[in-house]
C-alpha cells in the first residue's frame, strides 16, 4: 500500500507545512471515520471526552519520553502558529510591560520578527543583530552584549528562511541567571536536546511535529508560577497548564497528528536515530553543492549551516536559471524548492519525513541540470 502511494506522491521539500511521513497519513486515513471504534471521527470527538483525553495524555507522555522531559516541566498545546508567542511570551513574563528589558539574539527573519513584535510588550535589547551581515553568519558569543536586568533572553535555534542553525552549545553561552527562551519551530524533534538547559521551548508543529495550527510549549513549572495573572486566556500559560490545555477547545485533530508522528519517531528508534539520518541528508546535499564548481553556491557560514533548511543560489543568483531549475524539477516530481520571497534563490527543507533516497533523487536532478546548463 505504501509503495503504491509513493508512486503518485511528489518529493515535497517545502519549508512548511512540511512533508508528513506516509505511515502517519495512512494511519490517520484508517482512523478518520471511526476513531478507535467509537463510531466517530477524531475530528468529532469531544475535547473533554475519554477518547481525546487519552490522545492528549499519550501525546504528552511520548513527548516526555523522546526528549527526557522531567516532571519539572509542563507541556502545553496552544492554538495558532509559533509567531503568536512573539507576543504571548512577553505578555506572560514581563510583569512591568514595556519597562521590562528582554534580550534578543537576532540571527534571521524569525528572531527579527520576535524582537519587532516584542517592542509592544517590553523594552527590546538586541544582544547581537546579524542583519548587517545579511544573516549569513553569527558572531562569537563572547561579543554578545546582554542586559544585566533582562527578564529573559530569546533566540531562534533554526532560522527557516535564511538557513542558519545555532550550535547545540548555544545555551551554555547564555548568562546562567537569565531565563532562557528558545524558538525551535523548524528543528524541533530533529535531534536530541537537553531540555534542562532551557526555561521555555516553543515550536510550531508544521515542520517535524505535525500540521499547521498548533504550537507546542515546554515550560518550567517554576516559571509558570511567575507569569502575570492578567493575561488573556488564549495566551495564559498558567491557565493552560492548570487545565491540561483544555480550558477551551484545542486543535484536537492537530494534537492527534502530533501524537501519531511521535509514535513514528519512537518506531524509528528515537531522536538519536533521526539525527543520524538528518546529518546524512544534509551532508550529502551540502557536499554536492560545495563541489559543484560554484554552479550551486551556499553562502552560509559552514559553522551555522542548517540541517533542516538548505538555502543556495545558482551562479551567484542567476534568476533565469533558478526559475528554470524550479520548473524542470517540478516535472521530475521535486516540488516546493523556491526560496522565501524575502531572500529569493532556492531552499530545500530536509525535515524528518524526507528520506535519504529522496535527497539522492534531488542531487541526481541537480547533477543533470548542472550538466545541461553549463
UniProtKB/Swiss-Prot annotation:
It comes from the Eukaryota. Keywords: Amino-acid biosynthesis, Aminotransferase, Pyridoxal phosphate, Serine biosynthesis, Transferase. GO terms for biological process: L-serine biosynthetic process; serine family amino acid biosynthetic process. Binds 1 pyridoxal phosphate per subunit. It is an enzyme of class 2 (transferase). InterPro entries: Aminotrans_V_dom, Aminotrans_V_PyrdxlP_BS, Pser_aminoTfrase, PyrdxlP-dep_Trfase, PyrdxlP-dep_Trfase_major, PyrdxlP-dep_Trfase_small. The modification N6-(pyridoxal phosphate)lysine is found at residue 207. It catalyses: O-phospho-L-serine + 2-oxoglutarate = 3-phosphooxypyruvate + L-glutamate; 4-(phosphooxy)-L-threonine + 2-oxoglutarate = (R)-3-hydroxy-2-oxo-4-phosphooxybutanoate + L-glutamate. It holds the Pfam family Aminotran_5. Signal peptide: none annotated. Its cofactor is pyridoxal 5'-phosphate. One of its GO terms (molecular function) is pyridoxal phosphate binding. Pathway: Amino-acid biosynthesis; L-serine biosynthesis; L-serine from 3-phospho-D-glycerate: step 2/3; Cofactor biosynthesis; pyridoxine 5'-phosphate biosynthesis; pyridoxine 5'-phosphate from D-erythrose 4-phosphate: step 3/5. Catalyzes the reversible conversion of 3-phosphohydroxypyruvate to phosphoserine and of 3-hydroxy-2-oxo-4-phosphonooxybutanoate to phosphohydroxythreonine. HAMAP family: SerC_aminotrans_5. Homodimer. This is Probable phosphoserine aminotransferase. It comes from Dictyostelium discoideum (Social amoeba).
